[in-house]
Curated annotation (Swiss-Prot):
Superkingdom of this protein's organism: Bacteria
Subunit and interaction comment: Part of the 30S ribosomal subunit. Forms a tight complex with proteins S10 and S14.
KH type-2 domain location: 39-107
Keywords on record: Ribonucleoprotein, Ribosomal protein, RNA-binding, rRNA-binding
GO molecular function: mRNA binding; rRNA binding; structural constituent of ribosome
InterPro entries given in the database record: KH_dom (IPR004087), KH_dom-like_a/b (IPR015946), KH_dom_type_2 (IPR004044), KH_sf_prok-type (IPR009019), Ribosomal_S3_C_sf (IPR036419), Ribosomal_uS3_bac-typ (IPR005704), Ribosomal_uS3_C (IPR001351), Ribosomal_uS3_CS (IPR018280)
Keyword Transcription attached: no
Pfam annotation, one family: Ribosomal_S3_C
GO cellular component: cytosolic small ribosomal subunit
SMART domains named in the record: KH
Organism in which the protein naturally occurs: Chlamydia muridarum (strain MoPn / Nigg)
Protein name: Small ribosomal subunit protein uS3
Length: 224
């Protein structure tokens, strides 16, 4: 019987890189993992990081490097770099360590599952029809060159008394093919009748396996 699994975790260290790059012994591992989660939760709540597609955390000799992948780098950097400096100061206060912040621009936001999911969530919160938001997202993703896309929403859709799920799919989205580069993300829309969950799968084509050097020590590295 087939089981549901996360496409990203399923392919981590095979065709996808880890989102946390560090080594921790038995005493440090739990501490580092909790710290990573706190860093990510903190950044997700910052207005300047609302257009962020993801965060990568690296550790080296007592320092932390956080790479913010975003479609709006100017918003994260701020006027004359003021926002980045503010983030550094707040992260240092949160972790007690020196934190370096790098900004990486997402060149094609239409092909990023997290940005697509967030976009659908924002439309639903603005009372746009969930079907219209889903179909518009599918069209923009396919127009951008994806081989396939699937979007699913769950909850009290359109204020219905009974929660249900609806999904739309266009193209090919293989879930068991490891070499398939599947970008997957989730988001939630807070509405007056409850929370609507959104899931997005995007097939970006086939991808070669990640070189062993890129995931050495993967067993001791957390992908939070």
């Amino acid at each position: 019987m087939g089981q549901k699994g996360c496409p990203v975790g399923f392919r981590t260290a095979v065709t996808k890189k880890w989102r946390s790059l560090w080594y921790g012994n038995n005493q440090e591992f739990g501490k580092f993992l909790i710290e990573d989660v706190r860093i990510r939760e903190f950044l997700k709540k910052k207005p300047s990081c609302q257009g962020a597609a993801g965060f990568v955390v690296k550790r080296m000799s007592g320092k932390i490097e956080v790479t913010i992948h975003t479609a709006r780098p100017g918003l994260v950097i701020g006027k004359k770099g003021a926002e980045v400096e503010s983030l550094k100061a707040e992260l240092k206060k949160l972790t007690g360590k020196d934190v370096w912040v790098e900004i990486a621009e997402v060149k094609r936001p239409e092909l990023n599952a997290q940005l697509v999911a967030d976009g659908i969530a924002k439309q639903i919160e603005r009372r746009v029809s969930f079907r219209r938001a889903m179909k518009k997202a599918l069209q923009s993703v396919m127009d951008a060159g994806a081989l396939g896309v699937k979007v699913q929403v769950s909850g009290r859709l359109a204020g219905a008394e009974i929660a249900r799920s609806e999904w739309y799919k266009n193209g090919r989205v293989p879930l068991h093919t490891l070499r398939a580069d599947i970008d997957y993300a989730t988001a939630s829309a807070e509405t007056t009748y409850g929370i609507i969950g959104i899931k997005v799968w995007i097939n970006l084509g086939e991808k070669k396996a990640v070189p062993a050097a890129n995931h050495a020590g993967a067993a001791s590295t957390a992908a939070a």
